[in-house]
Amino acid sequence: MPVKLAQALANPLFPALDSALRSGRHIGLDELDNHAFLMDFQEYLEEFYARYNVELIRAPEGFFYLRPRSTTLIPRSVLSELDMMVGKILCYLYLSPERLANEGIFTQQELYDELLTLADEAKLLKLVNNRSTGSDVDRQKLQEKVRSSLNRLRRLGMVWFMGHDSSKFRITESVFRFGADVRAGDDPREAQRRLIRDGEAMPIENHLQLNDETEESQPDSGEEE
C-alpha cells in the first residue's frame, strides 16, 4: 500500500468522510477540512475507490463525489423524478441574480413558487398522484413531496439549512450536477430554463444515486449555525 494512501486511511477525518461519500454526499468548499483532505489525497483515494468500482470525481466547480460504475460494490438507488426536478430548479436559482441579492439564502416557498412557474404543474401533480384532479389536497401533497426532495438533496450536500430553520437554505455549487449542458456562447440561466421547461435529457452521469441504507441515519451535518 502506498505510504500516502496509508496516511489517508489513518487520518481521523477519513471514516466519517468515507461514509458520507458512499452515501452519495457531495463535498464542497464549504466543508473546509474534508475538502482540503480530498485535495491532498485525491490521487491515492481515486485508486482506493476504484477497487469498489466507483470513481472519485472532482467536478469543474471544485466539489467531490463518488460516481458508481455499473459493477459498483457500493449499494445505490436512483433519485426520483421529482427529486431531479427540484435539483434542476435549485441550479436555476443558483444562477439567478436573486442569489446575490439575498446573500445566497432562499426559502422553501420561493423554491416551490419557482417550480410552479417553470415546470408544468399538471405533470408535477401526476408525480404525486397519477389520478390527480388538481385539487387543493393534491397541491398540498406536492408541496410536502417538494420538502422531502429538498431534505434528501440536503443529505447529498446540495443545500445547507440555516441553523435549525429548515424553511431557509443556501444552495451549494454541487447543484451543477443538475445543470444544463451549456453550449458555446449560450446563457447558462437560459439553458437551465430550457432544461426545466422542455425536459431536455440530462447526461447519464447526472442520474444521481444515493445509498438508501444510510440515508435516514445520516446526521444533520448540512445545517449552519
Curated annotation (Swiss-Prot):
UniProt protein name: Chromosome partition protein MukE
The UniProt record lists the keyword Cytoplasm: yes
Record text on subunit structure and interactions: Interacts, and probably forms a ternary complex, with MukF and MukB. The complex formation is stimulated by calcium or magnesium.
Region described as Disordered: spans on this chain: 197-225
Pfam families: MukE
GO BP terms, alphabetized: cell division; chromosome condensation; chromosome segregation; DNA replication
Name of the gene this protein is made from: mukE
Compartment annotation: Cytoplasm, Nucleoid
Family (UniProt): Belongs to the MukE family.
Keyword Metal-binding: no
Compositional bias annotation for Acidic residues: 212-225
Annotated function: Involved in chromosome condensation, segregation and cell cycle progression. May participate in facilitating chromosome segregation by condensation DNA from both sides of a centrally located replisome during cell division. Probably acts via its interaction with MukB and MukF.
Keyword tags: Cell cycle, Cell division, Chromosome partition, Cytoplasm, DNA condensation
Lineage top rank: taxon: Bacteria
Organism, scientific name: Shigella flexneri
Signal peptide segment: none
Cellular compartments per GO CC: cytoplasm; nucleoid
